């Protein structure tokens, strides 16, 4: 029986309040309105962004909410005016929209669509939610809310992909892989023969390693306090790995000693201000580039000596790896299907949605790179 135009009852993982575990609940998902798409979510990754939400009571979020932004699924129905996808299409959800009309979308170097700011309201464009549970409205998250069997997303936050793409794999292209890989390829523009250092070897950092290797870097140094991640990092392209806790000197001094002149391209893939300062200080004084990939706390001010920039170092931000979301994501999926990209090593665990709190523990203890949740 068709569900088009009907309210759908399904399972979702809800955060009822800050610091609480996920609660599996039955929710009601309303039909899509104009320019909206309702999607049957098939697979979604548990990203570091969600881990930061779970680990902080200070983020400016509204509760209760349905998290999740690294998703892939199948279009169930579409609202009035939707023209780029149809029911049955396989799609990837996009936390970063591409409206195609704002100055960032129209600039060849920009990808931070102005419509992203709509996500800060945690509601749809009309100021309402499409989710209810126990008679209570549930807030959206990151334009996507993929920790729900069905979700409603604006058309500009949906990318149609290859009809035979394995959704349990390519969901990583929705955030983690694209963010890290693109930070090396697009933002830093890593050059052949260069030296790179990646601070943080989780899902995003591991993807940075892959991007550095693809760009032709000859020396890729992974930095992490969890030695268990070193084997995987080397498999992905890291030539050396360091644990700062094992060193007798600060990591930036060690990296200078190892390279004589500092690192060409450094990447901070954790979201830690102290690590960012160390990464910047590790860069070659004259032309080194440090790229901020990790999600830094908005409430904390960055304090770095201006002397670090005097000689020529540069610090760059990167969102979604510099990709224009709707334009580039289908191409990345096509590259995966053509075996030009390999996402499989990043996926260390696969669990059902009702095991989401187990996935959280795996992430907290550093036992997984990426856990995929099946819905």
Swiss-Prot record:
One of its GO terms (molecular function) is all-trans-retinol dehydrogenase (NAD+) activity. GO terms for biological process: retinoic acid metabolic process; retinol metabolic process. Zn(2+) 1 binds at residues 47, 69, 175. It catalyses: a primary alcohol + NAD(+) = an aldehyde + NADH + H(+); a secondary alcohol + NAD(+) = a ketone + NADH + H(+). Its cofactor is Zn(2+). InterPro entries: ADH-like_C, ADH-like_N, ADH_Zn_CS, GroES-like_sf, NAD(P)-bd_dom_sf, PKS_ER. Its main location: cytoplasm. Belongs to the zinc-containing alcohol dehydrogenase family. Class-V subfamily. Dimer. Alcohol dehydrogenase. Catalyzes the NAD-dependent oxidation of primary alcohols to the corresponding aldehydes. Oxidizes secondary alcohols to the corresponding ketones. This is Alcohol dehydrogenase 6. It comes from Pongo abelii (Sumatran orangutan). The lineage of its organism: Eukaryota, Metazoa, Chordata, Craniata, Vertebrata. The gene is ADH6.
């Amino acid at each position: 029986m068709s569900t088009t135009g009907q309210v759908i009852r399904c399972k979702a993982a809800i955060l009822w309040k800050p610091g609480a575990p996920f609660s599996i609940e039955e929710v009601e998902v309303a039909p899509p309105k104009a320019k909206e798409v309702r999607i049957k979510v098939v697979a979604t990754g548990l990203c570091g962004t969600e881990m930061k939400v779970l680990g902080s009571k200070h983020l400016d979020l509204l509760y209760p909410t349905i998290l999740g932004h690294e998703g892939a699924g199948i279009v169930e129905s579409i609202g009035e005016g939707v023209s780029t996808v149809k029911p049955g299409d396989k799609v990837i959800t996009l936390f970063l929209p591409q409206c195609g009309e704002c100055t960032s979308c129209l600039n060849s170097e920009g990808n931070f669509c102005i419509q992203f700011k709509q996500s800060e309201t945690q509601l749809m464009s009309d100021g309402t939610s499409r989710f209810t549970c126990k008679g209570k409205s549930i807030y959206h998250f990151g334009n996507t809310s993929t920790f729900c069997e069905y979700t409603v997303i604006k058309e500009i936050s949906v990318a149609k992909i290859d009809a035979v793409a394995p959704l349990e794999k390519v969901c990583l292209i929705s955030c983690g892989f694209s963010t890290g890989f693109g930070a090396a390829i697009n933002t830093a523009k890593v050059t052949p023969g260069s030296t790179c250092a990646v601070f943080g070897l989780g899902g995003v950092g591991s993807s940075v390693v892959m991007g550095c290797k693809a760009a032709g870097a000859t020396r890729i140094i992974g930095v992490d306090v969890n030695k268990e991640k070193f084997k995987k990092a080397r498999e992905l392209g890291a030539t050396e790995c360091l644990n700062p806790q094992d060193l007798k000197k600060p990591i930036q001094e060690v990296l200078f000693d190892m390279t004589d002149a500092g690192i060409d391209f450094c990447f901070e893939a954790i979201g830690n201000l102290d690590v960012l300062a160390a990464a910047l200080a590790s860069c070659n004084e004259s032309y080194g580039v440090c790229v901020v990939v990790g999600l830094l706390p908005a409430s904390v001010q960055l304090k770095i000596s201006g002397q670090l920039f005097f000689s020529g170092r540069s610090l760059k931000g990167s969102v979604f790896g510099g990709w224009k979301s709707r334009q580039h994501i289908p191409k990345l999926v096509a590259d995966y299907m053509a075996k030009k990209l390999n996402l499989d090593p990043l996926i260390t665990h696969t669990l059902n949605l009702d095991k989401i709190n187990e996935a959280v523990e795996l992430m907290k203890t550093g036992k997984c790179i990426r856990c995929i949740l099946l819905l």
